[in-house]
């Protein structure tokens, strides 16, 4: 059964839903889901990734909520999972990101679109690897992902693994 009312608790997943052609099914997003810009005009803002407005989400009566282990607060996601269908992604590397895309495609009856996107991503990765020098140096890098407060990538994270 295709999801008709989706709440996305993660900006990157919101963008994925749009890429899969599900823009009209999205009924709720976080205040950090800023792409595509026009999406916020037609959806309900359900708080931030760490401070969800659970009552607003309940009023939306979603048939699917998409969350992420690192982005969202476990207790809030568990409270929603007691009432609604919730998928929580846990992405630490490239292959897990592709697996999440496929899973979201399956959950939303958009598997062909998800598989096409995975193919595009793999092709882009192959093109990048073809031009990357074999003796590429590894540089220490400070990648700031947020300010107020300042936060950077570190440790065993998806972004760190991709870099």
Regions found by a protein language model. Give the residues of each.
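N-terminal ligand-binding lobe of clamshell/alpha-beta domains
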Residues: 1-163
């Amino acid at each position: 059964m295709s999801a008709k009312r989706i709440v996305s608790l993660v900006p990157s997943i919101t963008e994925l839903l749009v890429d899969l052609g599900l823009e009209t099914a999205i009924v709720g997003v976080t205040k950090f889901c800023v792409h595509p810009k026009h999406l916020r005009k037609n959806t309900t803002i359900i708080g931030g990734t760490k401070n969800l407005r659970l009552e607003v989400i309940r009023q939306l009566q979603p048939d699917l909520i998409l969350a992420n282990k690192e982005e969202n607060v476990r207790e809030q996601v568990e409270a929603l999972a007691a009432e609604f269908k919730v998928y929580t992604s846990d992405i630490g590397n490239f292959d897990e990101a592709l697996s999440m895309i496929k899973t979201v495609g399956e959950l939303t009856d958009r598997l062909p679109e998800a598989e096409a996107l995975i193919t595009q991503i793999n092709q882009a990765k192959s093109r990048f690897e073809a031009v990357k020098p074999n003796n590429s140096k590894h540089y220490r890098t400070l990648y700031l992902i947020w300010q107020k407060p300042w936060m950077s990538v570190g440790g065993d994270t998806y972004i760190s693994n991709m870099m």
